[in-house]
Amino acid sequence: MKKILLSALLLIGGIAMCPALTREGLTEYKLDNGLTVLLWEDHEAPDVTGYIAVRAGAVDEPAEYTGLAHYLEHMLFKGTQKIGALDWEKEKPIYDSIIDLYDKYSESTDPKVREQLATQINECSMRQAKVSSLLDFFVLHDMIGAEGVNAFTSYDMTCYLNTFPASEMYRWLNVFSERLINPVFRTFQAELENVFEEYNMYANDPSSQVQEQLQKDVFKGCPYERDIIGTPEHLKNPRLSKLIEFFNTWYVPNNMALVIVGDFDAEKAKPMIQETFSRLQPKELPARSTYPEVSFAGNPTKHYNLGYNPQIAWIYQGVKKGHPDEKALDFVCALLTNGQIGLLDKLNTKGDVSAAYAYSDARRFTGRIMIEAIPYYDANQQMFESDKATKAIVMKEIEKIKNGDIDDALIANVKRLYAQSYKTAEENTRYKVNALVSSFIYNEPIDDIFTDNEYYQNLTKEEIVRVAKKYFDAPYMTISFDEDTKTPKAKTLPKPNIKPVEPSNEETEYCKAFRKLPSEEYKKTFNNFNDVEISSIGSNVTLRYTPNKKNDVFTLTLRYGIGAHEMPLLPYAAALMSNAGIMGSPATEGKDFKQQMAELGADVSYGCDDSYFYISISGEDGNMNKIMNLVNRQLLMPYLEQKQLDQVKGSVFFQRLSRQKRATVQKSALLQYALYGKNSDYLDEVPFADIWGLGLPKVQSLLAEARSYALDVFYCGSLSKDKLVAELPLTEGMKSAKPLYIKDMQKYDKPTVLFLPNSNAQQADIYFYINGRPYDIASDVQSGAFNQYMSGGFAGVVMYEIREKRSMAYTAYGIDRKGALPGKDCYFYGYVGTQSDKVNDAINVYMDILTDLPKDSSNIDAIRIQLKQSAQTAKPSMRGKASTFEHWQRLGYKEDPAKTNANAIDAVSFSDIEKFYNENIKGKPVTIVLTGDPKKIDLKAIEKKLGCKVTKISNAKIFKSTQELYDAVM
């Protein structure tokens, strides 16, 4: 379930922008066939984002065929009777046979008969592949420089999306409309295996299991109780005819929207849209089902041993999308959780709980109010606080809401947070896309995008109290989870016995015609480093100043030239400072400090990496003086309660204690060990005894020391440079910054296999690592071309060989990674996530790729276009310009990399890719880093393939001993 904080509300439909944002550039209309068209010009966007939004998702599936919506999303990348068709007349009877065979397969319960039918389906699929081009759809997108070709399925919608240059508007509209006309669901059997892989990827993740169980209980009796991906039983019993039926029912123009946002001309686009999308034929939609509300009468409770740590959820009845109380209920939940000053946020700030938050989850048919908490962990007692005690703490705040005991200042400050969020939403192209999509999916007026903020600002306390009482003074369900110490295996889907398809991949007639379709001249625009004014404003103090002409919200980052490498305890001081108050002031407690900042429309956070200490501040320029006053006082006289210190220490204690049982952390630690050896983040970490001894005096001295080093100021706002400098906390005699710390990579001069056995893992993780050259920008274009050839989406060699042909994995890639600075090591980094019983096959195929790269020069034009488009759209946001330009300059660029590399991109050839491969990959020793179920992996076969012994790695090798934790607290 979504955990929605106010900062994330910009991505949720029904939330408004500031009144200053107008309809300028926005066009909405319908074609005669009922297709909704939503166009929003944004000429500061680097490209164009295009969506097809379908008002159908997992809730619209028949109960006996779950997973259809998600599986259909996968299949709509497989082409049509034109896209991907080499000879449709020959292909059609084979396709019809596959549909018929799947019907028989679904109806049969005899294992032998089903096995025979599966073999026949596989044989037909291989025959169909010979008369089709599996990659056609992706090659077409590569031709136009489309990026981020993707889709997603939720309960209420399915969306297909990517970005593309405006010069390719006509061809993009052509292929995006064509994909919806007579689609052909090729390689259905193989793609089902990819869905199996996706299912298995989450099946043994305890966190995913917790969320799945919540869904089942919270939405009992409604399709929302089902997992979007479908049940194992239904996934094992597919029926292609039902997929076709689902498409024919819901994928009709009167149930879809075309959403285009970005740097384009809407008037030019309209006739193109008419020509391409008016081809879709409308149909009458079936009546949607309705579902009775679940009763929480009697305050039912449920308990499960599931997950990594205790967790409690209290669930109230909410409202569905479009309900008259929806917006007011959102606001009430923001009074509890907004990331800064909510009633539950204060519990987090004080250290009373490990985490607590609330949100309203409104959906098409129903809604829920979710209150969730993780209890406080006491490192002294080495246990979590009881559910009963945690409930008392959380429900005390809920009682305030329920009883209307809501402070006027809190209401005013939350309104201020909303208003400021909507101001900055104007800068966000993604917000515009999501707002339009949500408006369509939930039949909300487009005008709400522009008027909702006015609604929130005019919301009265009486209305807030009415809604709070109505929904919180009601029965609720309690669901609690305790850590599952047994780690039970979830149901996973078996490896089928199918042969890989061998598509022809000749060029189709549609592809040939597509090449000739008109496109406009590619518009080259480049970033100008002079957009950021750089000046020295003191000894070892540099200002990077970016003017903000859009609104009065500033962002200010103070970056000091020392980090965790030199001061290992600094990250913990930073974590504590984010919740600190000011000693001896009205803002003594952290919650009071946050309240004062909120009254100024401001926020501050602290962070640290290996090389730098950061203070990040945002707020309204008109309040800069007061904001900086508060921040300076907090830095000079921080106040921390003992429980805040204990909460951070307890969090670190539990994380280190439990991480050896977490598969995601295990694989991260194994990879860190392979890449950095003893300098792994999990081995070269602060002794817990040092953290345990951390107190307020030490925090103060750490801050004072960090702030004595060179300062880089990154500002984006509307103040003049002189006014800004007058407000900055500048001191004399700042020391030179410490050198940037970049870890050295491990060197492997022979093939190596590092294996961490995990008998509980169905999902295996395979990493491939090859030491590379010292980094220099001169190799960027060749490296980029190689990466595009290897992992440029589904048409890349790795995805094509591993997933598209053989269905071995849901995720697979291989790229050349740049060194962090000139002279630092580059390296090849590859990955395959697959079932343990497919590991040997996946390693064999991947090693064959690395040993002898498949050669296909036919796509070099598309690779060139992709490189050009990627370079052209690497345009940072207004607030990101300063840091991005600095990064490019550190790498060695004196201007926009797109400009420097333009000629090299135009001239790149397939021989450049071959040369890069020969110099950096071919014949180099490969290190494989592997974790999975040892009973399902043939280690001897891996040794034979690599020509080396497999080195088994234990947790003791990649983690520090937990004994240091107990020694510290004794």
Segments and roles (model prediction):
Residues 1-22:
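Bacterial Sec-dependent N-terminal signal peptides
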Residues 20-39, 265-304, 311, 317, ...:
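Proteolytic maturation boundary segments
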Residues 40, 45-61, 67-69, 84-178, ...:
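M16 family metallopeptidases and their MPP-like homologs
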Residues 178-186, 277-284, 395-406, 632-640, ...:
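A common structural junction motif
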Residues 196-203:
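Carboxylate/His-rich catalytic cores and anion/metal-binding grooves
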